[in-house]
């Protein structure tokens, strides 16, 4: 099953958190990480509801939720947008004893980007914001990197091809030893345009454990595009390990989970048994929870992954989804896996 063109989701593109949402009304609230702690208890501590506005202090709300018994950490993230144009608020918790995704300490080196890359990337972000507001976010990943349909964005992305070829070593050094998280995020995105994708896979997989959310998200976007090219050219030398993506399905950060699930849909397209076994061992509860999210484009990747991991045929998965039987499938697969 194709993931609705497998377009990477632009959630306040290349940024994270509530600040980018600018206080819109909440259309949908969804949760993840709930195992023993109930949704009702988290909702009470959240103290906002559908139809209200996003909380003015993300940190204050997270702190309230973290006071609940059994909650180690909480995280709020707003995504744009539901079918009515309202914000989607994701509330994640990590319970005591639950799976935990570890990040590396911040790098302490002195690597920095070549000066000419930074202003072009800044213009790229601005162009993406304009394109997103007008709904022009379609992109082509078949070259192993993003080329958006919007001509202004695409022209800037095409400059990244030259930068990645010219400055591969510099980008690699910034990812591993750059003290500035913004520069590491830029490097993780631009290096994805390298002409020989197979030579930078290890650098991007290293970035998947960066302590900064945006660095990880950009690395996932780059690797997800590599996976599209790998599927198109199965004899290529591109080899992407699914392990860190699978571990990220248990992350406290919504962007980690969402982008990891999108990438894994491509990486499990061949249904390689060793990868499906990893999903069954490490991520079935997380997948079932994510597959039940109310916003269907966000739920679909996990729904596909849960179905594949549990041996459901692709046609049956697609048929049940189109008939609106998603929740029944999730319940059935979850029950079967628990036996």
What are these regions (language model features)?
Residues 1-7:
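Positively charged n-region of N-terminal signal peptides that target proteins for export
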Residues 7-17:
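Bacterial N-terminal signal peptides
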Residues 22-35, 44, 48-107:
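Periplasmic polypeptide-binding modules associated with outer-membrane biogenesis and secretion
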Residues 52-56, 245, 287:
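Ordered, soluble secondary-structure elements with a strong preference for glycine-centered loop motifs
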Residues 100-198, 206-209, 213-243, 247-258, ...:
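Extended repeat-based scaffolds of very large eukaryotic assembly and lipid-transport proteins
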Residues 263-264:
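Alpha-helical scaffolds that organize eukaryotic protein assemblies
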């Amino acid at each position: 099953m194709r993931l609705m063109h497998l377009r990477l989701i632009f959630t306040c593109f290349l940024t994270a958190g509530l600040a980018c949402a600018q206080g819109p009304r909440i259309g949908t609230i969804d949760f993840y990480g709930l195992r023993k702690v109930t949704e009702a208890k988290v909702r009470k501590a959240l103290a906002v509801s559908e139809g209200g506005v996003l909380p003015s202090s993300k940190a204050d709300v997270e702190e309230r939720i973290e006071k609940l018994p059994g909650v180690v950490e909480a995280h709020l993230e707003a995504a744009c947008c539901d079918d009515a144009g309202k914000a989607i608020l994701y509330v994640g918790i990590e319970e005591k004893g639950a799976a935990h995704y570890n990040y590396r300490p911040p790098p302490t080196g002195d690597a920095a980007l070549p000066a000419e890359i930074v202003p072009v990337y800044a213009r790229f972000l601005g162009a993406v914001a304009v394109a997103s507001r007008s709904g022009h976010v379609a992109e082509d990943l078949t070259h192993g990197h993003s080329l958006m349909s919007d001509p202004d964005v695409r022209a800037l992305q095409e400059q990244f091809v030259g930068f990645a070829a010219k400055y591969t070593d510099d980008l690699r050094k910034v990812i591993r030893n750059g003290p500035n998280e913004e520069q590491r995020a830029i490097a993780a995105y631009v290096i994805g345009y390298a002409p020989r994708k197979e030579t930078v896979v290890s650098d991007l997989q290293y970035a998947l454990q960066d302590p900064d959310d945006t660095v990880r998200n950009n690395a996932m976007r780059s690797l997800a595009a590599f996976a599209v090219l790998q599927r198109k050219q199965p004899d290529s030398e591109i080899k992407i390990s699914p392990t860190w993506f699978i571990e990220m399905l248990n992350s406290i950060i919504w962007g980690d989970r969402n982008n990891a699930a999108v990438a894994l849909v491509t990486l499990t397209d061949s249904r390689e048994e060793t990868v499906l076994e990893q999903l069954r061992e490490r991520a079935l509860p997380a997948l079932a929870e994510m597959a039940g999210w109310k916003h269907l484009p966000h739920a679909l990747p996990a729904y596909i992954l849960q179905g594949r991991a549990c041996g459901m045929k692709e046609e049956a998965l697609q048929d049940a989804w189109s008939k609106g039987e998603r929740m029944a499938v999730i319940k059935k697969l979850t029950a079967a896996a628990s036996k």
